């Protein structure tokens, strides 16, 4: 009789996992990124309108 061949699940078959290690970078949620972007856009608009009066 032939031996039964056991196979491993294909989920991790030699693929690199990029998120296994914890990095020391700043972690921000997608909502936080959108909020910071909107704040930056509003700040730029305010500087564009009011800036010439303040900075000459």
Curated annotation (Swiss-Prot):
Compartmental location: Cell membrane
Its membrane topology: Single-pass membrane protein
Cytoplasmic side: 1-29
Gene Ontology BP terms: protein transport
UniProtKB keywords: Cell membrane, Membrane, Protein transport, Translocation, Transmembrane, Transmembrane helix, Transport
TM helices/strands, residue ranges: 30-49
Extracellular face of the membrane: 50-56
Organism expressing this protein natively: Pyrococcus abyssi (strain GE5 / Orsay)
Cellular component aspect of the GO annotation: plasma membrane
Family as reported in the entry's similarity comment: Belongs to the SEC61-beta family.
This protein's name: Preprotein translocase subunit SecG
The gene coding this protein: secG
NCBIfam families: PRK01253.1
InterPro entries according to UniProt: Preprot_translocase_SecG, SecG/Sec61-beta/Sbh
Summary of subunit composition and partner proteins: Component of the protein translocase complex. Heterotrimer consisting of alpha (SecY), beta (SecG) and gamma (SecE) subunits. Can form oligomers of the heterotrimer.
Role, per record: Involved in protein export. The function of the beta subunit is unknown, but it may be involved in stabilization of the trimeric complex.
Listed HAMAP family: SecG
Keyword presence, Transmembrane: yes
Chief site of localization: membrane
């Amino acid at each position: 009789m032939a031996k039964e061949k056991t196979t491993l699940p294909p989920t991790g078959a030699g693929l690199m996992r990029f998120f296994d290690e914890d990095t020391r970078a700043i972690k921000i949620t997608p909502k936080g990124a959108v909020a910071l972007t909107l704040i930056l856009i509003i700040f730029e608009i305010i500087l564009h309108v009011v800036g010439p009066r303040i900075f000459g």
